[in-house]
């Protein structure tokens, strides 16, 4: 297989894993684009992205423009004379002039089965909606938001115990393999581009902390999906006894209850059962303010009086 001269554009750890796969391949990564260094940690020290750190460790030139809309940045990119640009969770918009610069254009690795879940949070939204599968799409980029022609798709079943954290790990393994397959198909002409069906498209909006508040007026199934979707960020939570209590793990109980939504049905080391508008949600792992996440048995040892049966947990509207 012919080797390609590649510009890689990406920022977080998910992207760095794809860069590592390219570095391990026969292709030549001739330049890396990543977001400018950002303040991080308690000291707000300027911190390089995982992609930048990996590029520096491998002596690859790094470019960190604040925008690619200006001509000097575009000329700098064109001067690299790349065959193709690979984009993974970069975070900057690529104008048409940039998309058209490499000989084979720009391709993107997206963490969903397009056209479902275009946008910023596809992994989380698939869980949030109760999807049965997700996957990776390699697409030829155009000026739209994840609207380009699809070159290759992989599929991954979503298990009942999956969270955003676990799906992230699985897709971070699947994505690099799919990327290398797509590059091989592009070079030997075996990939057939497929148009996206706009009728099937929807958008994965960014998550918000407010959205993670548990509303007991929803069904137990929906709340279970939210707990999994919002792990590890922003983490589902409810207010009780003047405290914000995070919920890291839960499942739908087989218990039947006619109690008002938000009422604690039972509390034991097996879990805290809470009535919802439809069904009962069992809380398995929680986090008290200023503490680490704990299983329910340890929570009850510390604050059992907070979770006595028939106690009502406040709803969002109350």
UniProtKB/Swiss-Prot annotation:
The keyword RNA-binding is annotated on this UniProt entry: no
The enzyme's E.C. designation: 2.1.2.9
InterPro entries, per the entry: Fmt (IPR005794), Formyl_trans_C (IPR005793), Formyl_trans_C_sf (IPR037022), Formyl_transf_N (IPR002376), Formyl_transf_N_sf (IPR036477), Formyl_transferase-like_C_sf (IPR011034), GART_AS (IPR001555), Met-tRNA-FMT_C (IPR044135)
Disulfide bond residue pairs: none
Gene3D superfamilies: Formyl transferase, C-terminal domain, Formyl transferase, N-terminal domain
Residues noted as binding (6S)-5,6,7,8-tetrahydrofolate in the record, renumbered to the chain: 112-115
One GO cellular component term: cytosol
Top class in the EC scheme: transferase
UniProt catalytic activity: L-methionyl-tRNA(fMet) + (6R)-10-formyltetrahydrofolate = N-formyl-L-methionyl-tRNA(fMet) + (6S)-5,6,7,8-tetrahydrofolate + H(+)
Short name of one Pfam family: Formyl_trans_C
Molecular function (Gene Ontology), one example: methionyl-tRNA formyltransferase activity
Keywords, in A-Z order: Protein biosynthesis, Transferase
Function: Attaches a formyl group to the free amino group of methionyl-tRNA(fMet). The formyl group appears to play a dual role in the initiator identity of N-formylmethionyl-tRNA by promoting its recognition by IF2 and preventing the misappropriation of this tRNA by the elongation apparatus.
Annotated family: Belongs to the Fmt family.
Name listed for the protein in its UniProt record: Methionyl-tRNA formyltransferase
Source organism per UniProt: Shewanella putrefaciens (strain CN-32 / ATCC BAA-453)
Classification of source organism: Bacteria, Pseudomonadati, Pseudomonadota, Gammaproteobacteria, Alteromonadales
Gene that encodes the chain: fmt
């Amino acid at each position: 297989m012919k080797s390609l001269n590649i510009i890689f554009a990406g920022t977080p750890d998910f992207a760095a894993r794809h860069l590592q796969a390219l570095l391990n391949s026969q292709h030549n990564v001739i330049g890396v684009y990543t977001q400018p260094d950002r303040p991080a940690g308690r000291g707000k020290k300027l911190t390089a992205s995982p992609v930048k750190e990996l590029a520096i460790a491998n002596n690859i030139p790094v470019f960190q423009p604040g925008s690619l809309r200006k001509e000097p940045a575009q000329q700098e990119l064109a001067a690299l004379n790349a065959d193709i640009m690979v984009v993974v969770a970069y975070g900057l918009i690529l104008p048409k002039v940039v998309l058209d610069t490499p000989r084979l254009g720009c391709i993107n690795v997206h963490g969903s089965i397009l056209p479902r879940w275009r946008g910023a949070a596809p992994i989380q939204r698939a869980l949030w909606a109760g999807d049965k599968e997700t996957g990776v799409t390699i697409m030829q980029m155009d000026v739209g938001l994840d609207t380009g022609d699809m070159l290759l798709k992989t599929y991954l079943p979503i298990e009942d115990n999956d969270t955003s954290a676990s799906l992230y790990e699985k897709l971070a393994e699947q994505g690099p393999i799919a990327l290398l397959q797509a590059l091989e198909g592009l070079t030997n002409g075996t990939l057939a581009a497929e148009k996206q069906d706009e009728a099937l498209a929807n958008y994965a909006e960014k998550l918000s902390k407010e959205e993670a508040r548990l509303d007991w007026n929803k069904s137990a199934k929906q709340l279970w999906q939210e707990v999994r979707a919002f792990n590890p960020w922003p983490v589902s939570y409810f207010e009780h006894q003047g405290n914000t209590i995070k919920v890291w793990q839960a499942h739908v109980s087989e218990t039947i209850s006619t109690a008002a939504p938000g009422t604690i049905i039972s509390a034991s080391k097996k879990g805290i059962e809470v009535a919802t508008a439809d069904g009962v949600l069992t809380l398995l792992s929680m986090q008290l303010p200023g503490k680490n996440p704990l299983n329910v048995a340890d929570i009850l040892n510390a604050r059992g009086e907070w979770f006595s049966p028939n106690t009502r947990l406040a709803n969002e509207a109350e």
